[in-house]
A protein has these predicted regions:
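Structural motif
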Residues: 180-190
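N-terminal exported-region signature
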Residues: 1-176, 190, 195-286, 291
Length: 312
C-alpha cells in the first residue's frame, strides 16, 4: 500500500485503506508504524476502500487483467474489483451466479453514496445500475465460487444510471445498511415524491426514503416476483442507504450499531422503529403515519339557542 498510494501519502491526502480477503478485514494507515498495519499488499481482482481528505483522481500503472481473468469468491461477502474495460448492468455481470441462485446481493459506492442490487426484488427497487471499470463492489454469495469471471461486456455503451438525490445533511460513510418497504397515511396529507426521514435517537439524519406510488409498469415487473403483493396506487418506499458512524473520525457522524432508528414525515413520527445493523444488507419496513390532533374544543350548539343541553 505504501507504494501504490505513495503520491497520496506524499501529499498528506491518504487517511486509511481497508481491504477484505480470506482472513477477513485488513487495514493500512500511513500515520502508524508499519507493524500495526494488517493490509500488506494490493492484489489483482480485489476491491479496496480508500479514504482521502480531498477529492483526487487516483492513477495507477500496470498490465490490464483482461477479460479472461478469474477470481475465487468465498461464501459470504467478497470485496472485488470490476476489471473489464466496458461497463455492464449487474444482471448481466452476475448472470451465471443469478442463474444458479447463488448471488445474494451486490453493493457499490459512488458520488451519491451507497447503492444496492438484489436479484430477488423487482428492478425498480435496485439502485445499483452499472458496474464500471476502476470501481470495487461488495458481492455476497451463498456458496464459494472457483474462478469467477465476468462475461464479455460487448461494445462500450452508456448505461442509464439511477439518479439519486442526496441530502447534504446526511454524512455518507463506509458503514451502512439498506432499507425499503411500504407506507400508509391516515387522516393526513402526503405527496408522492416526498421523502421519509430516518433519524437516530439523538435526532441525527442518517437516511431518507422516497415515497413512490405503484404504477401499471411496476405491476408488470411484479409478475416475475410473486412474493411481492402490491396493488395499483399503493405507496412504496424506495430502497435507500442508512449510514453508520465513521470510525476514522472523532465525532459521531452516523448511526451506532444497535441504536434504534426513527421514521418521520412532516414532523409526524411512525410508531415503528428498527435497529441499525450496519451489515450492508436490506431491512424491510411497513410504516404507518397517522395524524392525531393534540387539541379539542366544544362550541355552542347552533342555531337553537333555547336548548341549553347538548348530547355528545
Amino acid at each position: 500500500p505504501a507504494d501504490a498510494f505513495a503520491t497520496l501519502i506524499g501529499e498528506s491526502n491518504l487517511v486509511v485503506v481497508t481491504g477484505y480477503g480470506a482472513t477477513g478485514a485488513n487495514f493500512f494507515d500511513p500515520t502508524v508504524p508499519p507493524f500495526l498495519n494488517t493490509l500488506t499488499s494490493i492484489d489483482e481482482g480485489f476491491g479496496y476502500w480508500v479514504k482521502v481528505n480531498n477529492e483526487v483522481t487516483l492513477s495507477a500503472e500496470g498490465v490490464s487483467l483482461g477479460g479472461g481473468f478469474a477470481k475465487d469468491l468465498a461464501a459470504g461477502w467478497n470485496l472485488i474489483g470490476y476489471w473489464l474495460e466496458n461497463s455492464q448492468e449487474p444482471a448481466d455481470a452476475f448472470a451465471t451466479l443469478i442463474g444458479e441462485s447463488n448471488l445474494v446481493v451486490v453493493t457499490g459506492y459512488g458520488a451519491t453514496g451507497a447503492n444496492f442490487y438484489d436479484p430477488s426484488v423487482p428492478p425498480f427497487l435496485n439502485t445499483l445500475s452499472s458496474l464500471d471499470n476502476g470501481s470495487g463492489y461488495w458481492v455476497k454469495v451463498n456458496s464459494a465460487v472457483d474462478g469467477f469471471t465476468y462475461p464479455a461486456a460487448g461494445l462500450a455503451r452508456q448505461i442509464a444510471s439511477m439518479h439519486q438525490e442526496t441530502n447534504p445533511e446526511i454524512v455518507k460513510t463506509n458503514e451502512f445498511m439498506f432499507i425499503n418497504g411500504e407506507v400508509n397515511f391516515t387522516d393526513m396529507d402526503y405527496t408522492v415524491g416526498d421523502k421519509v426521514e430516518i433519524r437516530t435517537e439523538s435526532g441525527m439524519l442518517v437516511g431518507e426514503m422516497k415515497i413512490i406510488a405503484v404504477t401499471d409498469e411496476m405491476l408488470d415487473e411484479f409478475d416475475d416476483f410473486p412474493e411481492f403483493k402490491c396493488s395499483l396506487g399503493d405507496n412504496l418506499l424506495m430502497t435507500a442507504p442508512i449510514y453508520g458512524d465513521d470510525w476514522t473520525t472523532e465525532e459521531i457522524d452516523g448511526a451506532i450499531k444497535g441504536e434504534n432508528l426513527r421514521f418521520i414525515y412532516n414532523d409526524i413520527e411512525a410508531e415503528l422503529t428498527i435497529e441499525y445493523t450496519g451489515t450492508m444488507e436490506l431491512a424491510k419496513v411497513d410504516l404507518e403515519f397517522r395524524f392525531i390532533p393534540d387539541a379539542y374544543a366544544l362550541r355552542q350548539k347552533y342555531p337553537n339557542p333555547f336548548n341549553n343541553v347538548t348530547t355528545i
